[in-house]
């Protein structure tokens, strides 16, 4: 077969028009767009707020300043009139992104969705059409084993450690820009739920108390160990997390606590306890220690519920009997630590022989441990098909991520090795549980 000349490749690429919507708070999308443009692709960007504009403006960029109700007609027309062939966006559940994906699929546009990596640190997620419950990655063990075998060994060596400043500074700059320049984009509907300035003030106070919180967490774990307490871990999730708001039937994590505490009271052995682990990015709007104490007392398990507000997950996992989670990526960490995991709604890793498929009542008494061969295959298959190397929280990592995303989009190699299953294999089960998708 004759090789394609560079000129032929450029002409072929020039027929493709790539539209970028909101990206993560980093230079990632601008860098990715630059790489695609260098390959001859037409590159477009729609900005929705001043923070978006700050990250990327100039050639190929337009601003959407109309009301959100006008977005469906706008994006439908934009896709058609500009001949868009590929759509790239970060997260699939933001209002503007949900609509754009729907309109893009209707026009046979290739949709690439990015998110922070499932195998953090040092990875980014890149999937076709949807994430989490809407992921097209298979959920049956046979297919996963087949993908892992086809992909071969993937280098999982940790790379690109996160920088505190690259996590925090871009977030602060982006959101404060939106606050002070809101008159330029008065109709913009943000996807976060907390006022940014209040969130940063609370976060600063929490950071000042971090050493004290970590010490308290160590003392609590030492006390539980000394008393030989048998406990499960329940990692809390953020109220603003789309995993809760869109990929579960719940409006608040308080409802999750009610379900778990009631089951603990009525169905678990009397010597089983729960350790709640706060989310590392929670700044305290909800007062989860107070909420959990009130609920635990209501269900009569106040002496069996403990709140851990510091440290990571590795230490509490060491002595845990297992992990109960809504659908957090912490569940995958628990599986990698060899712990049984029960998800309350379908998570990406909620797969037969990996997670406990029975109800909470059976989980308390006889939790199913993950099959180590399947877990290894799942991680290899995931890394090879829906993850790319790189990180937005590392200066070198963001460049690597841009290179890898641009390469994958250019050759349309998302969900590779046969890892695209339609319809999304987790969706029917999620809808049966009341997930609003």
Predicted feature residues:
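Conserved catalytic-core segment of nucleotide-activated headgroup transferases in glycan assembly
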Residues: 39, 185-291
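Leloir-type glycosyltransferase catalytic cores
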Residues: 137-182, 354-437
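Structural motif
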Residues: 17, 85-86, 231, 273, ...
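N-terminal subdomain of nucleotide-sugar transferases
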Residues: 1-49
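Donor nucleotide-activated moiety binding/catalytic core segment of transferases
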Residues: 66-80, 280, 285-330, 336
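Active-site and donor-binding regions of nucleotide-sugar-utilizing enzymes
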Residues: 25-31, 48-144
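A donor-sugar binding/catalytic signature common to diverse glycosyltransferases
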Residues: 86-92, 96, 309-355
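Catalytic core of nucleotide-activated saccharide and alditol-phosphate transferases
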Residues: 112-211
């Amino acid at each position: 077969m004759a090789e394609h000349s560079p000129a032929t490749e450029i002409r072929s690429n020039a027929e493709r028009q790539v539209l970028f919507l909101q990206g993560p708070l980093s230079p990632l999308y601008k860098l990715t767009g630059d790489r695609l443009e260098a390959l001859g692709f037409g590159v477009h960007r729609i900005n929705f707020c001043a923070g978006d504009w700050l990250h990327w403006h100039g050639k190929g960029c337009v601003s959407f300043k109309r009301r959100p109700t006008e977005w469906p007609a706008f994006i439908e027309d934009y896709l058609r009139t500009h001949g868009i062939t590929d759509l790239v966006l970060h997260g699939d559940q933001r209002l503007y992104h949900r609509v754009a994906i729907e309109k893009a699929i209707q026009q046979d546009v290739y949709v690439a969705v990015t998110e922070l990596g499932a195998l953090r640190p040092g990875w980014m997620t890149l999937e076709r059409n949807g994430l989490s419950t809407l992921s097209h990655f298979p959920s049956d063990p046979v297919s996963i084993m087949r993908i892992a075998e086809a992909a071969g060994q993937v280098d999982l060596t940790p790379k690109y450690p996160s920088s505190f400043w690259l996590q925090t500074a871009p977030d602060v700059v982006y959101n404060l820009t939106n606050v002070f320049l809101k008159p330029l984009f008065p109709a913009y509907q943000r996807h976060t739920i907390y006022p940014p300035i209040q969130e940063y003030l609370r976060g600063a106070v929490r950071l000042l108390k971090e050493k004290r919180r970590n010490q308290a967490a160590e003392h609590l774990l030492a006390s539980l160990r000394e008393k030989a307490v048998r406990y499960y871990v329940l990692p809390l999730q953020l109220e603003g997390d789309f995993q809760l708001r869109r990929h579960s039937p719940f409006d608040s994590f308080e409802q999750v606590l009610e379900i778990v505490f009631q089951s603990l009271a009525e169905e678990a052995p009397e010597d089983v306890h729960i350790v709640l682990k706060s989310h590392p990015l929670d700044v305290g709007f909800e007062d989860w220690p107070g909420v959990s104490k009130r609920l635990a007392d209501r269900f009569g398990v106040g002496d069996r519920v403990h709140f851990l507000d510091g440290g990571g997950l590795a230490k509490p996992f060491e002595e845990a009997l297992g992990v109960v989670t809504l659908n957090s990526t912490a569940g995958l960490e628990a599986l990698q630590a060899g712990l049984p995991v029960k998800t309350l709604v379908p998570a990406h890793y909620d797969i037969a022989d990996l997670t406990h498929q029975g109800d909470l009542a059976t989980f308390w008494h006889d939790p199913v441990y993950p099959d180590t061969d399947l877990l290894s295959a799942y991680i290899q298959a995931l890394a090879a098909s829906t993850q790319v190397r790189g990180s937005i929280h590392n200066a070198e990592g963001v460049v690597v991520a841009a290179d890898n995303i641009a390469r994958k989009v250019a050759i349309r190699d998302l969900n590779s090795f046969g890892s695209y299953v339609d319809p999304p294999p987790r969706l029917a089960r999620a809808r049966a549980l009341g997930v609003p998708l």
